[in-house]
């Protein structure tokens, strides 16, 4: 069956922003109780060490996604952008991102692209927060890992969506 390509770019700056926002809100919630130490450890900051650790967690999440979605992803030699373009640059920049190039049948439902894009982003954010909390707030880490893993079946389902063939059109 004929194939087509879809590309989804996940921006690193947006990932860092969402991670910072979610961890800030979690620390504020913890602070409303008597958990001041947990609140201080829960939030991320802009220190080089913190960004470096989060960046490594983001890389791990992207690598896991590539393994899970491998049957849809082009080989590395065919799609140049699929390689880790951030390999040696730890600094957070808005322009840089991870490009997922998927090979899908022509009858793939393009209505699923927004959901897939959002789910990939959410998976990476939840996985990175889970990794962060594994070091700073172990009680919360498993909840974020579960949220990340819970997105995978939904991503698989969205990747399997197809449109019906109509008479007079080619596949």
Regions found by a protein language model. Give the residues of each.
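Conserved short "hinge" loops at termini or chain/domain junctions
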Residues: 1-113, 147-171
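Structural motif
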Residues: 113-122
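C-terminal or internal capping secondary-structure element at the end of a domain, subdomain, or sheet
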Residues: 136-138, 153-154
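Short conserved catalytic/interaction loops centered on acidic-Pro-aromatic/His motifs
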Residues: 137-147
């Amino acid at each position: 069956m004929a194939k087509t390509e879809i590309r989804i770019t996940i921006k690193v700056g947006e990932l860092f922003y969402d991670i910072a926002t979610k961890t800030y809100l979690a620390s504020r919630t913890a602070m409303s109780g008597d958990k001041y130490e947990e609140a201080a450890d829960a939030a991320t900051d802009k220190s080089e060490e913190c960004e470096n650790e989060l960046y490594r967690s983001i890389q791990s999440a992207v690598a896991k996604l590539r393994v899970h979605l491998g049957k849809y992803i082009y080989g590395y030699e065919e799609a140049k952008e699929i390689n880790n373009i951030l390999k040696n640059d730890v600094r957070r920049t808005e322009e840089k991102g991870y490009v997922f190039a998927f090979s899908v049948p022509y009858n793939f439902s393009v209505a699923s692209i927004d959901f897939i894009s959002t789910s990939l982003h959410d998976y990476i954010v939840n996985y990175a927060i889970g990794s962060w909390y594994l070091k700073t707030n172990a009680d919360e880490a498993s909840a974020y890992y579960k949220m990340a893993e819970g997105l995978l079946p939904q991503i698989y389902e969205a990747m399997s969506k197809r449109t019906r063939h109509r008479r007079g059109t080619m596949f």
